[in-house]
Each structure stands twice: as C-alpha cells, then as structure tokens.
C-alpha cells in the first residue's frame, strides 16, 4: 500500500490560491472586536484594583488605626495588588499594543482613585487635576483610534 498525501476538504492551503492574501489585517480577523473589548475591560479592572489597593494601603497605615484594621488593610492591599497584576497581564495579552494597555490602566487608576478618595476620605480634586485627566482621556482616545490609510500609503500598496 502506498501512502499518498491525503487532503481533507476543509484544509485548503494558500499555495492553491496564490493571488489571495495570506492573512487578513488584524482589524478584520475573526473576533478582533471581542479581543479588543476584553483587553479594554481587563485594563479598566486592573486600574480599579490598583486604586483599591492604594485606598487599602491608606486605610492600613493611617495615623489612628488599631492593629486589626491595619492587618485587614494589608491583606486587602495585597489581594487588590495581585488582582491588579492579573487583570493587567490579561489586558496585555488581549491588547494589540502595550501602550494602549498601559494608558488605559493609568486612566482607569486615576479616575477610580478620585472616586474612592471622595467616597472614603472626602477628598476633592482641583480643576487642574481634572484638566489633566481630560488630557489623558484625549490621548487615550487618539491611541485607540485607528486612522484610515492616506492616499499616498494606499497608492504604494
């Protein structure tokens, strides 16, 4: 018996169709939007857990804290930090760029820190601080935005 190459009907190689592109662009691949959503979601969660860790540390090492509250704050800080790094690494794996993931985590952390600071400690932020948050949000929007290719770039292809 001669064992010849067996081909299944489902597997078609790219060599059979030499004029077809080998791979679609990343934005057109199956599940690209879903991956992008989960990347952003994980990065937002990482920022929130980072802010929660900072709030727990402030609670644990405050000026008038008993030993039980201090231990509880340290455990909460360690747990929130480990969750933050877990979500950040998952966000990096889903994200198309580490810059996008880093800026998303930073924005989420700053915003959640402001909210937790107001809710837990009654802290209010200055208008200049909110202006900085707005500029970070503008930069984040520009990073997440995908510009269409220019006429010159499309002509070269």
From Swiss-Prot:
Q: Which GO terms describe its cellular component?
A: membrane
Top-level taxon in the UniProt lineage = Eukaryota
| Keyword Membrane recorded | yes
Topology in the lipid bilayer: Multi-pass membrane protein
Q: InterPro entries annotated for this entry?
A: TMEM42 (IPR039632)
Q: Where in the cell is it found?
A: Membrane
Q: What keywords are assigned to this protein?
A: Membrane, Transmembrane, Transmembrane helix
Q: What is its main location?
A: membrane
Transmembrane parts of this sequence: 37-57, 67-87, 100-120, 124-144
Which PANTHER family does the UniProt entry name for this protein? TRANSMEMBRANE PROTEIN 42
* UniProt name for this protein: Transmembrane protein 42
**Higher taxonomy:** Eukaryota, Metazoa, Chordata, Craniata, Vertebrata
């Amino acid at each position: 018996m001669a064992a010849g190459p067996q081909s299944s009907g489902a597997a078609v190689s790219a060599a059979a169709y030499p004029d077809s592109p080998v791979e679609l662009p990343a934005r057109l691949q199956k599940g690209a939007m879903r991956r992008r959503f989960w990347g952003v979601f994980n990065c937002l969660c990482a920022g929130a857990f980072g802010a929660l860790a900072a709030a727990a540390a402030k609670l644990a090492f405050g000026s008038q804290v008993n030993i039980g509250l201090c231990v509880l704050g340290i455990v909460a800080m360690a747990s929130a930090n480990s969750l933050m790094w877990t979500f950040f690494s998952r966000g990096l794996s889903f994200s198309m760029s580490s810059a996008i993931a880093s800026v998303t985590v930073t924005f989420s952390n700053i915003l959640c820190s402001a909210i937790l600071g107001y809710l837990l400690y009654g802290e209010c932020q200055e208008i200049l601080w909110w202006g900085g948050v707005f500029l970070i949000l503008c930069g984040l929007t520009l990073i997440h935005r995908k510009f269409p290719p220019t006429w010159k770039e499309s002509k070269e292809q």
